[in-house]
């Protein structure tokens, strides 16, 4: 007779529970892998003219000077929050928490959003240095500069959504003839200010990407000014090398930054067309955009390769740096043409 205090199926129950746990773990892993592939997709480029036209039709707006640039800024910011997987940088759950490529892409996009939002608030929307700033832009720009990695209280997405709402309100007023205090001034001096920001961003990205291989650099920080000084000592020659763990981070940051910049420059081509044509600089801007578009080509390897210069394997970072450097050289020439041409 079997003793009921020691059932014979106790081991089977434990085995069944372990088996169930194993299948649950495998299913969880499989679902997260699928989500990783889904989240890891970068948004496609969009047509800024179509976006502006569609937004104007949906909200009953008129496409006036500055409408395309502002609508493009809105679309890029909205895409940042609502692309596949949403905004990933501040996620604390898998698979997002173990992904770093798309969060770095998001950061690159965010930097460009912040730069254009700042220029829109301080320059594009103001006629003179003594003029009043727009209230909606005054509310929107600081919210875009909120911590990009805040999960709660308040979370990043909530702040950026508020920034988008304020920016949309500015756009509504901009296209309303009865709202004369909302303006966008497409002037050469305003565009020069923005291009100077772009120069620095692209120059910094190019330097970080070029450091994917060991580089000996001369310290040129004080060159061109015999009376210049700096806070602390730096050697006259520097050896620069990006950590292996940051190679793909820098690459995807640059890819996100150039993705956003392509759209912003396309929009500027529309709103500043008269200024650019007067300076005979429209073709120069289009060539810059074409150089940046090359940075968005498909990547055909499962990881970012980091070959050594002319070595056997490709070096994706150096290729990206080449495109960005050429675009930056074009930006510098365009800015000088607008200043002196």
Where are these regions (language model features)?
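N-terminal Lys/Arg-rich, disordered targeting/topogenic segments
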Residues: 1-16
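Hydrophobic membrane-insertion alpha-helices, especially the h-region
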Residues: 22-36
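Extended amphipathic alpha-helical interaction segments
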Residues: 160-289
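Long, amphipathic, charge-rich alpha-helical segments that form helical bundles/coiled-coils
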Residues: 136-174, 284-309
